[in-house]
């Protein structure tokens, strides 16, 4: 699941990910995707021991902490505030149980609907909303593989 | 992963899912979520042997077959046609390799951006776009658990 979250982060316009815990095999597979499809020059993949220190650092930098949780405020009711929130954004998504600390230290707890579904979907929808869909036109200059969109079938250009 | 796809289908407004293959444990866990959070009256969860027969039946019924694939046409370039496509929609998402047959028998091959990421995210974005975000206000009459959105922390009403 974490792999899908990270691939969504990259494909939907995030600048990188902090991953709590250690998973060498997963990081290796991610770096392979980035090497082929692009993003090596800027997309950060960092394993960390404790997310709380990152949250505190982020606050000191003057950024905004967004926690995506089904218990939060519906994103539809938050949409008009997107323009005013201070960047950079740190977006927190949790797999299983997320500690209460994050709820109380996030600037905003935002729900992608108040129903159980998936942190993968939650991150995708949030990024799609803040970038207003433009992220889906992203091109990666250092990509070795590029897709030529097709009505049916597959067309890919390979370089490098 | 299939569990996440199904939870997204339910939470984002689909009427049900056909799952190719057999996975009793997974179906049981899904039905448990539906029993608690609602949707039992209409949300179909059906295991099937072969997706192709469903596609053919769907066509005979006059519905539209949408295949979500990174090789397809960017959803942003398809958006204006949403109003004209004939319902009901059968949306095909594949985990690993999807057979060429589906590419050539779908009415539309649509890409949620032409980058590798996740079928979970692809389905969520597609449904969010066709329902214009309204699906995130969905309420389930038969729900035994309901969330009261909170700025911080969790508030849930349990009934039945």
From Swiss-Prot, chains A, B:
Subcellular location: Cytoplasm
InterPro entries xref list: Alpha/beta_knot_MTases (IPR029028), tRNA_m1G_MTases_N (IPR029026), tRNA_mtfrase_aTrm56 (IPR002845)
Keyword field: Cytoplasm, Methyltransferase, S-adenosyl-L-methionine, Transferase, tRNA processing
GO BP: tRNA nucleoside ribose methylation
Enzyme Commission number, as recorded: 2.1.1.206
Pfam families the UniProt entry points to: Trm56
GO molecular function per UniProt: tRNA (cytidine(56)-2'-O)-methyltransferase activity
Coiled-coil residue windows: none
Any one annotated GO CC term: cytoplasm
SUPFAM superfamilies, per database record: alpha/beta knot
Entry-linked Gene3D superfamilies: 3.40.1280.10
Domain of life according to the entry: Archaea
Residues binding S-adenosyl-L-methionine: 68, 94-98, 112-119
Catalytic activity: cytidine(56) in tRNA + S-adenosyl-L-methionine = 2'-O-methylcytidine(56) in tRNA + S-adenosyl-L-homocysteine + H(+)
Function per UniProt: Specifically catalyzes the AdoMet-dependent 2'-O-ribose methylation of cytidine at position 56 in tRNAs.
Membership in a protein family: Belongs to the aTrm56 family.
PANTHER family: TRNA (CYTIDINE(56)-2'-O)-METHYLTRANSFERASE (PTHR42197:SF1)
Quaternary context: Homodimer.
Protein name in UniProt: tRNA (cytidine(56)-2'-O)-methyltransferase
Organism phylogeny: Archaea, Thermoproteota, Thermoprotei, Sulfolobales, Sulfolobaceae
């Amino acid at each position: 699941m974490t792999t899908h979250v990270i691939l969504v982060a990259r494909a939907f316009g995030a600048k990188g990910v902090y991953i709590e815990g250690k998973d060498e095999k997963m990081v290796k597979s991610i770096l392979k995707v980035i090497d082929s499809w692009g993003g090596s020059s800027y997309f950060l993949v960092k394993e960390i021991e404790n997310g709380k220190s990152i949250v505190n650092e982020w606050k000191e930098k003057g950024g905004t902490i967004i926690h995506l949780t089904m218990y939060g405020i519906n994103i539809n009711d938050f949409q008009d505030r997107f323009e005013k929130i201070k960047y950079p954004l740190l977006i927190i998504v949790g797999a299983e149980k997320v500690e209460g600390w994050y709820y109380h230290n996030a600037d905003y707890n935002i729900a992608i609907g108040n129903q159980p579904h998936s942190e993968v979907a939650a991150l995708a929808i949030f990024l799609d909303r803040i970038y207003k869909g433009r992220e889906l036109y992203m091109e990666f200059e250092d990509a070795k593989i590029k897709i030529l969109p097709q009505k049916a079938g597959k067309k890919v250009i390979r370089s490098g």
